[in-house]
Amino acid sequence: MRHFLTLDDFSKDEILQMINLAGKIKKEAKVREFKPYLKDQTLAMIFEKSSTRTRVSFEVGMYQLGGHALFLSANDLQIGRGEPIKDTARVISSMCDMAMLRVNRHETLEEFAKFSQNPVINGLSDKFHPVQLMADYLTMRERGSGEKIAYIGDGNNMAHSWLMLASKLGLELRIATPKGYEPDAKILEKAQQNAKISGAKIYLSNEPKEAVSGADVVTTDTWVSMGQEAQKEKRLREFAGFCVDENLMSLAAKNAIFLHCLPAYRGYEVSEAVFEAHADEIFAEAQNRLHAQKGVMVWLNDKR
């Protein structure tokens, strides 16, 4: 049995297997051919943090795969009253076939997976957002993008996930953050170790122009994530100059695409003009959450 907590847990071949499976299932969905890969199975969806795309994509995905999704907020569970994570994991995994968690702390996810009888999927944690990266890479493949990626902004869970994807698949990744907002040192070190095997190229700087120059893919994330509202004014000051605007985007490769995991805050991490110019790519990326996650779930089910 396998869990899907971080892309670092998988080989290049395994990641591509999931991507290829997602592409196959997406083609079937386009002609309304929904095969019951997960017939009569139940996915428990546990949300400590709210989300539009995560809930809708997993719930619709399970329905299209012949299964059922059960939504559970922290208020619906005894976790909110102090029940140990390990006990909740034991109970839920005895009744549900798979679990997806969107949590504040990655350690919560790891504890749940440790005591779960069935596969556990990371729907988002403070350290990683791997399902989003599966959608992003599926979008890159569909668009025929090159493999030079520029990530501009906060060295957060999205930056960490790009580090894992790039280092596993042998991509070139350039990350530009303000000083003091670099990716976690241990995660960066692991990515650099992976890169020695895969041939990936990883660069860090504090200069957005340097990162974007010649990039095939430009991506960013919100400067103020959920739970960081008290830091908003400070962050907005320190991220000045890191907005992906027309001038910055003009430095990328001629046919470069722009990706954003959403929600986007126009005028902050991305300008209105850049967002609207690349809206087709961004919303294709959002829809690919549905297809990429179906690929992940079916793959995990096959590995029991």
Swiss-Prot record:
Q: What is this enzyme's catalytic activity, as reactions?
A: carbamoyl phosphate + L-ornithine = L-citrulline + phosphate + H(+)
Source organism per entry reads Campylobacter curvus (strain 525.92)
Q: In which pathway does it act?
A: Amino-acid degradation; L-arginine degradation via ADI pathway; carbamoyl phosphate from L-arginine: step 2/2
| InterPro entries, per database record | Asp/Orn_carbamoyltranf_P-bd, Asp/Orn_carbamoylTrfase, Asp/Orn_carbamoylTrfase_sf, Asp_carbamoyltransf_Asp/Orn-bd, Orn/put_carbamltrans, OTCase_ArgI
Tell me, in a sentence or two, what this protein's role is.
Answer: Reversibly catalyzes the transfer of the carbamoyl group from carbamoyl phosphate (CP) to the N(epsilon) atom of ornithine (ORN) to produce L-citrulline.
Gene3D superfamilies the UniProt entry points to = Aspartate/ornithine carbamoyltransferase
Q: What is its EC number?
A: 2.1.3.3
Gene coding for it:
arcB
Identification of the protein by name? Ornithine carbamoyltransferase
Q: Does the keyword Ubl conjugation apply?
A: no
Record's keyword terms, sorted: Arginine metabolism, Cytoplasm, Transferase
List the Gene Ontology MF annotations in alphabetical order: amino acid binding; ornithine carbamoyltransferase activity
Which Pfam families does the entry link to? Answer: OTCace, OTCace_N
User: Which EC class heads this enzyme's classification?
Assistant: transferase
